[in-house]
């Protein structure tokens, strides 16, 4: 499929059915990483076999960890404390910012040298937000623009504890520092301006570690040793978001999504749908290990515009592209603000979302830190060609936009969706 142009479903009269979205990308990454650091075996069920998470597996294999992956099932034979080996080859994170930033935190605590590279997109994403605090802890990191961009060379070991106030609410920054803290003698803490997703904190506890949370400050007392465990990875709410929006805006639709992760640091998309007036219900809420999960049903809804900003942004930052599409089908003017972090994702998602949705006739404009969307707008696809720009979330958003549009549309670089949702197009077809 790479490099081709895919015909998208348009003129869709309804979407109906039940699907189970793939495992959560954030949790899948962390499960492999902590399993690699733990003593003993870790068994991961419902792992996401997307390109990003496979990059994480590849990197830890190069660090000497025995990992067996068969589809959505993964077994990690943990290396234990001090068990990682100096890699003979460069560590290629591919397109995965999570792999890059969290791996830097782990490597900071290792008494050896490693080189980290990625694809063209990663080479443009800022790493100083992670390399700066890790350098303050004592890690030696060199790279382009004083360590702000890959390729990066790192030599770790002999870290000092750090009390760090992060300028951004970023789970990747927080996690990198906490992971380095596992190898540090003393208490290391991170204070954020807003609460970011907390999968790392929950998972460290699942592996037998201790993490303290006090308001916006998370701290860890090191060094700590982890024990292998069993993990069921919930369905990724960021992947579910595309079908939640599709169910709300495509006529005559009803979609049920099974076993979706409902971590409260990730459910901003549900809050937005409810505030806009969506017909949404959540059933069978229960806990799997440390994460809440449930089944979500969404039906075609009459929506109204809202303002989105402030504390909710870290809880839905990855969902903003599909929320922008949602807003085109809501009556009134929706304002998305405080989301400048979108500029340093796989693409500049502010500019990319605006440019691509305008091809469908959306009334949308970019701002310095978000977007303004005026609805409700009929979407048209007069033989248009839209482009994922190699960004998985842009590609999936455009496929849902096409479902609402009259005419015909094709998508360039559809293969990008495999980063987080390899079966996305198959699941979409199953609802037609």
UniProtKB/Swiss-Prot annotation:
3-phosphoshikimate binds at residues 25-26, 30, 170, 172, 318, 345. CDD domains: EPSP_synthase (cd01556). It catalyses: 3-phosphoshikimate + phosphoenolpyruvate = 5-O-(1-carboxyvinyl)-3-phosphoshikimate + phosphate. Keywords: Amino-acid biosynthesis, Aromatic amino acid biosynthesis, Cytoplasm, Transferase. Belongs to the EPSP synthase family. PANTHER family: AROM/DEHYDROQUINATE SYNTHASE, PENTAFUNCTIONAL AROM POLYPEPTIDE. Monomer. Catalyzes the transfer of the enolpyruvyl moiety of phosphoenolpyruvate (PEP) to the 5-hydroxyl of shikimate-3-phosphate (S3P) to produce enolpyruvyl shikimate-3-phosphate and inorganic phosphate. This is 3-phosphoshikimate 1-carboxyvinyltransferase.
């Amino acid at each position: 499929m790479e490099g081709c142009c895919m015909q998208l479903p348009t003129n869709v009269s309804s979407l109906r059915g039940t699907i189970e979205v793939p495992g959560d990308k954030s949790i899948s990454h962390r499960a492999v990483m902590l399993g690699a650091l733990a003593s003993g075996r870790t068994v991961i069920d419902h792992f996401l076999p997307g390109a990003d998470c496979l990059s994480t597996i590849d990197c830890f294999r190069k660090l000497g960890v025995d990992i067996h992956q068969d589809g959505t099932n993964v077994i990690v034979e943990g290396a234990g404390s001090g068990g990682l080996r100096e890699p003979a080859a460069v560590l290629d994170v591919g397109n995965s910012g999570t792999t890059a930033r969290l791996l830097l935190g782990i490597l900071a605590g290792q008494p050896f040298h490693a080189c980290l590279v990625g694809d063209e997109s990663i080479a443009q994403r800022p790493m100083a937000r992670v390399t700066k605090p890790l350098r303050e802890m004592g890690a030696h990191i060199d790279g382009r623009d004083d360590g702000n961009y890959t390729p990066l060379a790192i030599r770790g070991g002999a870290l000092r504890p750090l009390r760090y106030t992060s300028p951004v609410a970023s789970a990747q920054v927080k996690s990198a520092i906490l992971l380095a803290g596992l190898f540090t003698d003393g208490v290391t803490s991170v204070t954020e301006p807003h609460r970011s997703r907390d999968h790392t904190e929950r998972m460290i506890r699942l592996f037998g570690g201790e993490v303290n949370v006090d308001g916006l400050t998370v701290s860890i007392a090191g060094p700590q040793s982890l024990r292998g465990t069993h993990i069921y990875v919930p369905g990724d709410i960021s992947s579910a978001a595309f079908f939640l929006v599709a169910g709300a805006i495509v006529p005559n639709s009803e979609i049920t999504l099974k076993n979706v992760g409902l971590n409260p640091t990730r459910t901003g998309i549900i809050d937005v749908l409810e505030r806009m007036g969506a017909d949404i219900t959540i059933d069978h809420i229960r806990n799997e290990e440390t994460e809440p999960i449930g089944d979500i049903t969404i039906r075609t809804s009459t929506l109204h515009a809202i303002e989105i900003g402030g504390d909710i942004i870290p809880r839905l930052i990855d969902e903003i592209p599909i929320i922008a599409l949602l807003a085109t089908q809501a009556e009134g003017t929706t304002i998305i603000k405080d989301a400048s972090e979108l500029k340093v994702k796989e693409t500049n998602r502010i500019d990319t979302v605006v440019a691509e949705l305008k091809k469908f006739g959306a009334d949308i404009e970019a701002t310095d830190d978000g977007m303004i969307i005026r609805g409700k707008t009929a979407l048209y696809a007069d033989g248009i060609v839209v482009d994922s720009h190699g960004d998985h979330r842009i590609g999936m958003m455009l496929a849902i936009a096409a479902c609402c549009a009259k005419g015909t549309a094709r998508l360039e670089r559809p293969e990008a969706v495999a980063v987080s949702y390899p079966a996305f197009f198959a699941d979409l077809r199953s609802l037609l």
